[in-house]
Amino acid sequence: MKTRTYFLTALAAALTLVTGHTLASPPSVPTVEVLAMTHPPVKMALAPLREWFAAQGKKLKVVETDIESPQGEKRLAAVGLNGHIPIVILIDGQYRHKRKDGSTIEFLNFPDIPGAPSGVRGKWTTADVQAVLTERMKQP
């Protein structure tokens, strides 16, 4: 039994030296799905958020999907939504999140920015998405 334990310990040490990684689980990287229309107003509304995503590098996994494509419609339905929704931001598969003050926020429709169409203006901002992701990136 000691031989087996010694062998497994030596194997783990060798793998760590060769790969540079431990056998412990790697830290979880948040997945952000941006389901959005590809029209100019949507692109402009999401530009600051996309720039922030890019600045995070490998701390985030970002997946972009045209919400009007068959794949986008299928993903929208998978999270229980349908209809004319120009933007959905999913963080680890969820569009509803808790703020630090305990209130719930939904990352649906346009962010609450000047010039956003009133009928599809959400109650979220780029800072809200950043706050949720910043907290999420701190988690192991």
Predicted segments with their positions:
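Extracytoplasmic/secreted envelope proteins and their assembly/folding machinery
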Residues: 43-53, 69, 73-76, 126, ...
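Non-catalytic, surface beta->alpha helical segment in thiol-disulfide oxidoreductase systems
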Residues: 91-139
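Bacterial N-terminal signal peptides
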Residues: 9-18
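Second-shell loop/turn segments in exported
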Residues: 34-40, 63-64, 113-123
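Thiol-based oxidoreductase modules, predominantly thioredoxin-like and allied folds used
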Residues: 58-72
